[in-house]
Curated annotation (Swiss-Prot):
Gene3D superfamilies: Haem peroxidase domain superfamily, animal type. It is an enzyme of class 1 (oxidoreductase). The keyword Heme applies. This is Lactoperoxidase. Thiocyanate (SCN(-)) and hypothiocyanite (OSCN(-)) are bound in the distal heme cavity. The iodide ion (I(-)) occupies a position which is stabilized by the interactions with heme moiety, His-226, Arg-372 and Glu-375. Hydrogen peroxide is held between the heme iron and His-226.
């Protein structure tokens, strides 16, 4: 009788035990399914990465690389960036396979167990890749540990920040324009190349130069951009065939999103049906997995820290140093010099695309903190100046502090050079970029706040591409009297991509630096946006007659990144959102441009953010429109206020050191690191020689005496 009384409880316990066992079996089955699926995905993705590396090596050995192969050389992921992108691709491929299995077998969707999936892939929650020393006076190379509360905030190889949610065709990863016939807000999207042809292109180069901004103004923008963001491409497919499908046959699929040519496009006659386009690298989503939409990677630190000099990758940062010397120096070229002054070291990895630009000279690409250093000769020139300045600072600090070891000298010189980039950007560059909107978006510095998010936003990577419209069609080299230098003083822009030989074998950097100081940038004009040198001849090899279209690439990249449209960003910035032709005309102050845009897009809501932003008229005394002023200003304010090592933050430098730092200038950088003796006082403004130039003796020097150790 007593047993019967306890029978219900026993039965209930038995049921619970059976349920628990069933749950455990289901969990084990699910975990096993995830493990098997991830293993299969890893095999596929790893093969794609291996194939890509082999393919690139073979292409560079051919001595006749194509535009695509030159671009791939620049956008090829390395080191920890490569690992992060590989994990992102494995995660997305695994999730796709698991969802397919779930729908086929009608079982509970295993993708709900996203934590297990992330751990199996190797993602995990973002954590610092270095041990944080809260008392260290120096930044880490990776950007970790800047924010003590969230040590990974702003670090390299994390997702770009979203200020507005991503907008993909399928809500997850497919870009708008992917599926033929599918509309956005009721209208089909125009081809990216068609937008470039009808909105961005122009024929006549007359009257395009900016009468108030020097060529250095354009070049500084590129330097800053390469300090802040870089998203290498994904790896495509797992076979040579899939690569050929994208590269040669324009077959869309996987991470291939070719830029198709519209009917009667002049490029169609020489380049076939399309320009190949590979989608940007992305990372695993992070807990709590509120969104599974694809998030593109930023391979660099988000901080304005001169990472283009020192790298955001620890292994490369070490490789860039001269560790055989106790002076804290950066490594320099051991094979050639610029009239006794150092060049960047050559990249020892062979083969090098720069060698094939001139197969007689065969000058390799340079090795620098940013992989894009040899992309263009003026960029390589800028990198060279910063390399020399680091070594100059390190030697001078050693003279003041003989007891300092190489590590201390390296870190102190790096810290000063980082402050230099911050000061020039905020004191000299941004005020004449943002004009009257500077104070609105970047108020005076009030100190560091760990609650400010310093991460580079996804939209900023498009906003900062306004600089592509400031690039003129040719570059000039000038002699000591700022007159044309040598038999070829003017060089078409497209001949200077990967062109290291022009520097090493044909005059050094001084003639190029003088061109930066005395020649003008191109002016952003609504009817003359981007020079044909970039719109038709980007990365055009010397042995070929065609190149890429940078405007079409920028437009396609907006869609690849899932960028919301023009009006979404206007609303974000508290600006009006035009809906009609009249309203768009009011914003753009150009009925012709408004008509063209509506004819292509159907609605202002669909205008790609890069196109809409560059179409706006310039703000007073600035060089961008209101929307760009908002996006750029907001980003730079966050970069500054969310950086614990910002040069003005109390405790980073002493008051005496800060007083010295404020005397730094780009003109002094030139005086100290070239043979140039005459420079302008305001090098970002358009200057005429000799009226606006002074002797280097009239330019303030950086006084390093406040860095002298008390012990000395």
């Amino acid at each position: 009788m007593r047993v019967l009384l306890h029978l219900p409880a026993l039965l209930a316990s038995l049921i619970l035990l059976q349920a628990a066992a069933s749950t455990t079996r289901a969990q084990t089955t699910r975990t096993s399914a995830i493990s098997d699926t991830v293993s299969q995905a890893k095999v596929q993705v790893n093969k794609a990465f291996l194939d890509s590396r082999t393919r690139l090596k073979t292409a560079m050995s051919s001595e006749t690389p194509t535009s695509r192969q030159l671009s791939e050389y620049l956008k090829h992921a390395k080191g920890r960036t490569r690992t992060a992108i590989r994990n992102g691709q494995v995660w997305e491929e695994s999730l796709k396979r698991l969802r397919q299995k779930a729908s086929l077998t009608n079982v509970t969707d295993p993708s709900l167990d996203l934590t297990s999936l992330s751990l199996e892939v190797g993602c995990g929650a973002p954590a610092p890749v270095v041990r944080c020393d809260p008392c260290s006076p120096y930044r880490t190379i990776t950007g970790d540990c800047n924010n003590r509360r969230k040590p990974a905030l702003g670090a390299a190889n994390r997702a770009l920040a979203r200020w507005l949610p991503a907008e993909y065709e399928d809500g997850l990863s497919l870009p708008f324009g992917w599926t033929p016939g599918k509309t956005r807000n009721g209208f089909p999207l125009p081809l990216a190349r068609e937008v470039s042809n009808k909105i961005v292109g122009y024929l006549n180069e007359e009257g395009v130069l900016d009468q108030n901004r020097s060529l250095l103004f354009m070049q500084w923008g590129q330097i800053v951009d390469h300090d802040l963001d870089f998203a290498p491409d994904t790896e495509l497919g797992s076979s040579e065939y899939s690569k050929a499908q994208c590269d040669e046959y324009c077959i869309q699929g996987d991470n291939c999103f070719p830029i198709m040519f519209p009917p009667n496009d002049p490029k169609a006659g020489t380049q076939g049906k399309c320009m190949p386009f590979f989608r940007a690298g992305f990372v695993c989503p992070t807990p709590p997995y509120k969104s599974l939409a694809r998030e593109q990677i930023n391979a660099l630190t988000s901080f304005l820290d001169a990472s283009f000099v020192y790298s955001s990758e620890p292994s490369l940062a070490s490789r860039l140093r001269n560790l055989s010397s106790p002076l804290g120096l950066m490594a320099v070229n051991q094979e050639v010099s610029d009239h006794g002054l150092p060049y960047l070291p050559y990249d020892s990895k062979k083969p090098s695309p720069c060698e094939f630009i001139n197969t007689t000279a065969r000058v390799p690409c340079f090795l620098a903190g940013d992989s894009r250093a040899s992309e263009h000769i003026l960029l390589a020139t800028s990198h060279t100046l910063f390399l020399r300045e680091h070594n100059r600072l390190a030697r001078e600090l050693k003279r003041l502090n003989p007891q300092w070891d190489g590590e201390k000298l390296y870190q102190e010189a790096r810290k000063i050079l980082g402050a230099f980039v911050q000061i020039i950007t905020f004191r000299d560059y941004l005020p004449i970029l943002l004009g009257d909107h500077m104070q609105k978006w970047i108020p005076p510095y009030q100190g560091y706040s760990e609650s400010v998010d310093p991460r580079i936003s996804n939209v900023f990577t498009f906003a900062f591409r306004f600089g592509h419209l400031e690039v003129p069609s040719s570059m000039f080299r000038l002699d000591e009297n700022y007159q044309p230098w040598g038999p070829e003083p003017e060089l078409p822009l497209h001949t200077l991509f990967f062109n290291t030989w022009r520097m090493v074998k044909d005059g050094g950097i001084d003639p190029l630096v003088r061109g930066l100081l005395a020649k003008k940038s191109k002016l952003m004009k609504q009817n003359k946006m981007m020079t044909g040198e970039l719109r038709n001849k980007l990365f055009q090899p010397t042995h070929r007659i065609h190149g890429f279209d940078l405007a079409a690439i920028n437009t396609q990249r907006c869609r690849d990144h899932g960028q919301p449209g023009y009006n979404s960003w206007r609303a974000f910035c508290d600006l009006s959102q035009p809906q009609t032709l009249e309203e768009l005309n009011t914003v753009l102050k150009s009925k012709m441009l408004a008509k063209k845009l509506l004819g292509l897009y159907g609605t202002p809501d669909n205008i790609d953010i890069w196109i809409g932003a560059i179409a706006e008229p310039l703000v007073e005394r600035g060089r961008v429109g209101p929307l760009l002023a908002c996006l750029l200003g907001k980003q730079f304010q966050q970069i500054r206020d969310g950086d614990r090592f910002w040069w003005e933050n109390p405790g980073v430098f002493t008051n005496e050191q800060k007083d010295s730092l404020q005397k730094m200038s780009f003109s002094r950088l030139v005086c100290d690191n070239t043979r140039i003796t005459k420079v302008p006082r305001d090098p970002f403004w358009a200057n005429s020689y000799p009226y606006d130039f002074v002797d280097c003796s009239a330019i303030d020097k950086l006084d390093l005496s406040p860095w002298a150790s008390v012990k000395n």
